[in-house]
Amino acid sequence: NDTSAACGYAPLTPTEEAVLSTEKFINSPAFKLRFPETGEDVKVMGVRAGGQVELTVACAFVARHVRDLADYLAKKEHAAARVRALAASSGFAEAAVGVNVADDPANGSVYLTVTGLSAESGDDGQAGRGNRVGGLITPGRPMTMESAAGKNPVTHVGKLYNIAARLIAERVAAAPGVAEAECTLVSRIGRPIGEPQIAEVRVRT
């Protein structure tokens, strides 16, 4: 197989929960039915300062569902209002949400696409750069640069070990007296997947 290192952790922080729930909300079938102009390419950055969380949302809009600039701005505000309502229920004392904040309406520059994906403008990224198997990019947490989708979809340890490490961490974190758990798995090339070179769990009580 391959030599890979994978990490998992549990539980999610309130900020991580807010970011993940926001992305899932915008990409949910119900939201797309109400706001078909919102594309599938949705990125959410969350920053917390004490009891306040600030969410910056980038959402590619689909041009065929937008009549003109005024219609784009109105539809963006309607969608943003729904996201703000969700953020307000996230448990933070204050939640601020900005959607497509790089828009420059005065110069006719807004986040409008044909497909609803930023890839059409060459922003396709590289394998391994995107979200981890849990749906988040968390630089403040243990993580690996292994691509969950890389190499092959069946036995690639970069996928399997990341999923397994997350499930192990979740199981351990659910144990009485455990506040947080992290798991690291390391595979060794030539050895069966079920025999990791390292299987380490760290807990915080």
Residues covered by each model-derived region:
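Alpha-helix N-cap/helix-initiation motif
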Residues: P11, G150-Y161
